[in-house]
């Protein structure tokens, strides 16, 4: 896909980012990963993010990432595959070029590694990554990489392939300023942990879609919530929040890192051999797995 095509795809429905499957020794498990991605693509996700945050990008070696992206592309069908990208500028450029070579339809540029940086430094970092590839780029505003509206506008002027802005700050004032300034130059994606909890607020700020973590294991329910959100059916949204998302949030909040670990546990409970999370994350306890299994309930995948 060219940048404009991936921009259009991003805005055409609910998005998600598959967990990365590992075997018992912690190596990438390509067969079970492909099975899972193929299942998710069947729920009409227009774009899936391979090796993203929920895909444990932070624990992957750079040379594992194109292998994961290629595996996703093999089975995704009409679903576009966007790759995670990040770390320092030179590593990010290498990752971006490597995934472009294996067919990635775009990259999601996650925050750079560790250090805080001024706006001019963020500008230089993102510009260099964007200009290193021809595919579309989405920037992820969160943690130590928070672009202000003027910086983002400069990047849009310099980088035609910068087509998406994903927010994980929760700063509605900032994101509303950005949507007002940039208009339809970018596609806007919600990126808070368990994004459904914030979806109504972000919709009001001009974010028409988001990446759903729970789509990994209850894609039908995730689609139901998204359809109700876009149709303005607030009573349906509230019912699903109360029945599923708030109890899921309670499990997620029991330990740091469970925003990833709980999703991976859900994938295993749906019959996929997703394997454990990599350190420094930890898997759910048996008690917590039981809580999650009860919550999945009638949304269990049919064998």
Curated annotation (Swiss-Prot):
Pfam families: DHDPS
Alphabetical keyword list: Lyase
CDD domains recorded: KDGDH
Disulfide-bond pairs as recorded: none
Catalytic activity from the UniProt record: 5-dehydro-4-deoxy-D-glucarate + H(+) = 2,5-dioxopentanoate + CO2 + H2O
GO biological-process terms attached to the record: D-glucarate catabolic process
InterPro entries: Aldolase_TIM, DapA-like, Dehydro-deoxyglucarate_dehyd
Example of a GO MF term: 5-dehydro-4-deoxyglucarate dehydratase activity
Family (UniProt): Belongs to the DapA family.
Protein name per UniProt: Probable 5-dehydro-4-deoxyglucarate dehydratase
Gene source species: Agrobacterium fabrum (strain C58 / ATCC 33970) (Agrobacterium tumefaciens (strain C58))
């Amino acid at each position: 896909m060219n940048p404009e095509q991936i921009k259009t795809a991003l805005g055409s429905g609910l998005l998600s980012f598959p967990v990365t499957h590992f075997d018992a020794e912690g190596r990438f498990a390509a067969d079970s990963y492909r099975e899972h991605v193929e299942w998710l693509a069947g729920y009409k996700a227009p774009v899936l993010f391979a090796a993203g945050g929920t895909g444990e990008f932070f624990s992957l070696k750079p040379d594992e990432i194109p292998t994961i992206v290629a595996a996703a592309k093999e089975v995704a069908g009409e679903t576009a595959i966007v790759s995670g990208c990040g770390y320092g500028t030179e590593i990010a450029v290498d990752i971006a070029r490597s995934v472009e070579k294996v067919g990635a339809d775009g990259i999601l540029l996650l925050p750079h590694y560790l250090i805080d940086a001024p706006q001019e430094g963020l500008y230089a970092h993102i510009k260099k990554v964007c200009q290193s590839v021809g595919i579309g780029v989405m920037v992820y505003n969160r943690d130590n990489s928070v672009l202000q509206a003027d910086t983002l506008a400069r990047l849009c002027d310099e980088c035609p392939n910068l087509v998406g802005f994903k927010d994980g700050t929760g700063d509605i004032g900032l994101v509303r300023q950005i949507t007002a300034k940039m208009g339809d130059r970018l596609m806007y994606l919600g990126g808070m942990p368990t994004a459904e909890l914030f979806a109504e607020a972000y919709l009001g700020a001009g974010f028409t879609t988001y990446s759903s973590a729970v789509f990994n294991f209850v894609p039908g329910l995730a689609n139901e919530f998204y359809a109700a959100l876009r149709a303005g059916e607030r009573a349906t949204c509230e019912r699903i929040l109360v029945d599923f998302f708030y109890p899921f949030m309670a499990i997620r909040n029991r330990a740091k890192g469970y925003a990833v670990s709980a999703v991976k546990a859900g994938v295993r409970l749906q019959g996929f051999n997703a394997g454990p999370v990599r350190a420094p994350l930890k898997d759910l306890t048996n008690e917590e797995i039981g809580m999650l299994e009860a919550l999945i309930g009638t949304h269990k995948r049919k064998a």
